[in-house]
């Protein structure tokens, strides 16, 4: 377990020394929070509080989910996934294409955790209508976060 600098009790579990130096993950967290507050605000610091105690468990392998929802809210069974929220403070994330955080599902999973911290539900059906919380703005924010991180070649 590696502590993430600037985020009091945040940590990551990495499968090897190449997956991801703590300063890269910290930069991703800063970018996420900057964009979150720009898009949605955080007047009660619920999202900042979540980032202070989150644990990211990085993995080199994708997983198969027995059930879940696509980004547009359609249910699926037995599909490869690249990230999953496992509790209020724990998320599992596949290391990403080309071994880059910007090519992983980290920002996507942080949105789920932020929604859970802010509204009490992680909104598993994303832009679907079964659960509320996730909107197209959240999806747009993720794209902007990834683009910002890509500018650092991460």
Regions of interest found by a model, annotated:
Residues 1-99:
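A metal-dependent hydrolase signature that marks the N-terminal structural subdomain at the beginning
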Residues 99-104, 116-154:
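Post-HEXXH active-site segment of zinc metalloproteases
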Residues 107, 111-115:
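Short active-site segment of divalent metal-dependent hydrolases/proteases
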């Amino acid at each position: 377990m590696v502590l993430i600098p600037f985020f009091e009790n945040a940590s990551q579990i990495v499968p090897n020394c190449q997956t991801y130096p703590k300063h890269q993950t910290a930069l991703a967290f800063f970018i996420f929070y900057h964009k979150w507050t720009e898009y949605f605000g955080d007047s009660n610091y619920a999202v900042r509080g979540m980032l202070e105690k989150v644990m990211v468990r990085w993995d080199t392998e994708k997983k198969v989910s027995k059930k879940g929802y696509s980004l547009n809210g359609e249910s699926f069974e037995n599909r490869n996934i690249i990230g999953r929220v496992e509790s209020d403070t724990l998320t599992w994330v596949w290391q990403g294409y080309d071994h880059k955080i910007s090519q992983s599902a980290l920002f996507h999973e942080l949105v789920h955790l932020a929604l859970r911290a802010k509204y009490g539900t992680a909104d598993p059906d994303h832009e679907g209508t079964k659960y509320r919380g996730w909107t197209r703005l959240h999806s747009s924010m993720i794209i902007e976060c990834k683009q910002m991180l890509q500018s650092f070649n991460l």
